[in-house]
Each structure stands twice: as C-alpha cells, then as structure tokens.
A protein has these predicted regions:
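Histidine-rich, glycine-flanked metal-binding segment
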Residues: 1-39
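Metal-associated gating/positioning segment near the N- to mid-region
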Residues: 33-99
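Short catalytic-loop micro-motif centered on adjacent basic/acidic residues
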Residues: 74-76, 105-108, 237-242
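A glycine-rich helix N-cap at a beta->alpha junction
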Residues: 95-110
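Histidine/acidic residue-rich metal-binding segments in metalloenzymes
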Residues: 114-132, 136-310
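His/Asp/Glu-enriched, well-ordered alpha-helical/loop segment
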Residues: 202-235, 303-304, 308-310, 316-396
Length: 458
C-alpha cells in the first residue's frame, strides 16, 4: 500500500529494499518525498486507444497523458473484427513497441464466434482477460474497431452478442480462469427506448440516460451471472466495467450472495463527479452518467469496499468529431480521462473526506494488479516488485485544461475545474517519466508490454 517513514531503494528497475535510514546509501539519484504520499504506481484497467488513430500514434499521446496523471500501467481494451491469431494481434503488439511512456497490457474483446477459438492462444501470449459487449445486438450492433497499424479510415464492425456466443465465451474463459470483463446493458431495451425518445423529439444527457436505463444493466448482470454459475469451468471471474448506477450495484450484490462465481466492480471517475444535468454533450458516455443519488451511491460503494477498482474508460477523440451534429444521437460516446483519474479521487475523494488515501491506493493499484494477473510484479511497494511509484502532493492545486493533460483530445469534462491533489512524479520501473507535470521526451519507448498469467486474486 502506502509507504511512510521509509526509504525505497531501487536497482535494475526493481524495488531492492525498504530501509529506515538511507544516510549511508550511495545512489545515482536521491528523491526527497518528505511530506508527500508515495503510492504504488496507478494502473488504469480500462483504456481505449487505437480506435481513432492507429496505435503506433495513439500510444504516444495517451501514454504521455497517463504519465501526467500518475498512471504507470495502462490496459488497452482491444477490439479486432478478425481472428486474433494469424498475426493480427502480433501486428498490434509490434506497432505498440517503442511507443509507450508507461507500461501497458491488453484485454481482448471477443466479438464473433470465430474468435472464441483464439482464447487459449491469447492466454499463451499473456492476455488472460476477455471482454463481452452485452450491449451489442438487436439494431444497436455497430461499433468502431481498433485500426490496423498505419491505417486511418475508421473501421466499423457489426456485432450480435447472442446468448450462444456469450455462453461460449464464459465457458471457454472460465475453464482457463480468465477474467471476463462485462459491459452489461440490454440492447433490446435500449433500442426501444431510443426509438421512443427520437419520436418524441427529446435530446440531451437526460434523454440519453432515460434511453439506457439502469434496469437494463441490472437485467444483463443477472443474465451473465447465471451463465457464470453454470459454466463448465466451475464458476467464473466476472468483472463488471463502468458501473455507475445504484440499480447495477444492487444487482451485483444480489449475485454475490448466490456464490459460486467471483464478481468484481469497476467504476469510473465520471460516475463520481457528473450527473445527467451536466449541460454539455461532451459528457455522453455508455452507460450514461446518472442522478445525484447514483453519484452518492458510488462514493459509498467505493468507501465501503463494494467497488474493487477505478478505471477511466478513456477515449481519445477530438471535440469536432465528439459532438457530431450537435445532438445527443449523433455525438460520440466516450471522452478522455486517464490523466484526471488520480486528481479526481484525491481532490473529490480524499480532500473532501469521502475516502481515504489507502482506498485510493487499493482501487487504483493493488486490487487491479491482483484481479488482472500483475501482482506482485505491480500493485505493491515491496522488494522484488517493479519500481512503479506515484508521488502525490495532496495539497497541490491545478486548474484543469486540455493542454495540461497532454492527450490527443482537445477537450475534457473537467475543463476549468480546480482540483487539489496531483501526482508530481511518475516512476515506471525506476525511471522518472514525469516530474512536476513535465513528461521526459527521452522516456518514450520505456513502456513495455506486460504479459499476464493467471491472476492471484485471493
């Protein structure tokens, strides 16, 4: 967790020792973190990049933004329409190499029956987490795929997440103890509600929330949980992404009571800070931001340990593309967030007495590393672990601007917000990649792909 009154000795990219006194220690550099918090490097488990620009370019800007925000490892949510074998995943890995400031890993989205056969191969190359998009089906079946390296024309794919395909993913993933990430929404319900809303001529974030109701999430959570309990693997590890409503939380808690499978909950910073009364289309996201009472529920769940991790669902697009024709229906879903994850948790959480700094370390690093097979390499400050550290000044105030965050995106839902509590140094495997908001250009390429074996979850 958090280190206090201790000196951290780093050698060959690893933590060598934790010592009380460093007066007799010789080192090439000594960093004084007196009065600051030293956290295990933050891990963002939910990042989209490579969709609007090829990964060889997107990795450069978005891993730079990660470093600004104290994130030392980012996990890409990869969507390929073709098979992952046949060197398609190999091309993505090759294009990623040398283009990251921070370490990175990959979740594989399984979108078609043919890709189920790739699950054992994915595990062999260190990808042990699979994504199910329950929201894709009916006539809501189109989604942007990740671009091939060097390609720039946006690529759509048609996906029908049938019960048969979902069951196949859960069964095959559970047999090899993969973590199965779930986007839980019922596309039939959402499609019907969207049609009604358009016929009634309504617009805005409240309309978007109405069209993708929390009970749609709850239904889908119950459905996939039943598949998990009945899986041939003897139970599943289900990780519910971007949970932001009280109804979804209640559904997961109800499934936890039934046992057999393991259930993990991820929320995102925007579900802790924004409601559907926010007056701009830039906050369109799926599932939608909800009500004030939902925001309060998410903080309570975070404080009480019901929420296991915080991820950002970061998407790097430009404002002109984001807003579409200026209405909620043509606007793109998703926005940047990787650089503001820690500042939001520190400012709105720790400094406003909603959560402790220990909770921040747990939900941004320790839990994430354990769930996704990176512990004890990541997620902890102990001898033998990677020297991934985030030094935080809990009293540092900054006004958020897009330029401050150094992403490809030219907007942020936190534009103009004064946040107190910022990372002042991001250390990736012993290398200070960011200091006082400045990212070292020489650190480009330092980030490495992190293969992940079966997770240590207990």
């Amino acid at each position: 967790g958090i280190v206090s009154d201790t000196n951290i000795m780093i050698e060959d990219e690893k933590i060598k020792a934790l010592v009380r006194s460093a007066s007799n220690v010789s080192a090439s550099r000594k960093i004084d973190a007196t009065g600051k918090y030293v956290l295990p490097g933050a891990i963002d488990p939910h990042v989209h990049y490579g969709v609007y620009r090829p990964v060889n370019e997107a990795a450069r800007t978005e891993s730079r933004s990660a470093a600004v925000g104290g994130v030392t490892t980012m996990i890409r949510m990869l969507r390929l329409y073709d098979r992952y074998c046949d060197n398609n995943i190999g091309k993505q890995l090759q294009a990623s190499r040398g283009n990251h400031y921070v370490d990175y890993s990959i979740h594989a989205s399984i979108l078609r029956p043919e890709q189920v056969r790739d699950i054992p191969y994915l595990r062999e190359i260190g990808i042990n987490s699979l994504k199910i998009y329950m929201n894709l089906g009916s006539d809501l079946n189109r989604i942007h795929m990740d671009l091939a390296p060097g390609a720039y024309e946006l690529k759509d794919g048609v996906v029908q997440m049938t019960d048969e395909l979902m069951s196949s993913i859960v069964n095959n993933g559970s047999r090899i103890h993969s973590t199965i990430l779930v986007h839980a929404e019922n596309p039939v319900i959402c499609s019907e509600q969207i049609l009604k809303a358009k016929q009634n001529g309504v617009d805005g974030l409240e309309a978007w929330s109405y069209c993708r109701p929390p009970y749609s999430e709850a239904q889908s959570i119950a459905k996939v949980s039943d598949l998990g309990r009945r899986s041939s693997g003897g139970g599943s590890y289900l990780y519910f992404v971007h949970i932001g409503s009280n109804a979804a939380l209640d559904a997961i808690l109800a499934e936890r009571q039934k046992g057999r499978s393991n259930y993990y909950v991820e929320t995102c910073p925007h579900y802790l800070t924004h409601t559907n009364e926010f007056g701009s289309l830039i906050a369109k996201v799926t599932p939608p931001i909800r009500s004030k009472s939902d925001v309060q529920s998410m903080w309570s769940a975070l404080r009480n340990g019901i929420v296991d991790t915080v991820g950002t669902d970061h998407v790097a697009n430009r404002l002109e593309m984001k807003v579409g024709k200026g209405d909620i229906w043509s606007a793109l879903s998703g926005f940047p967030g990787i650089a503001t994850m820690l500042p939001v948790l520190l400012s709105k959480g720790v400094n406003e007495n909603r959560i402790s700094i220990e909770t921040v370390a747990r939900v941004t690093s320790y839990n994430t590393a354990r769930i996704f097979g990176m512990y004890p390499k990541k997620g902890t400050i102990q001898p033998g672990s990677d020297a991934d550290l985030t030094i935080v000044d809990i009293d540092l105030e900054k006004i958020v601007t897009p330029d401050l965050l150094q992403s490809y995106s030219d907007y942020t839902i936190y534009d103009g917000w004064r946040l107190r509590g910022w990372p002042i140094m991001t250390i990736v495997r012993g290398n200070p990649v960011m200091e006082d908001g400045e990212v070292a250009n020489a650190a480009l390429g330092h980030g490495e792909f992190i293969p992940r074996p079966v997770a240590i979850r207990d």
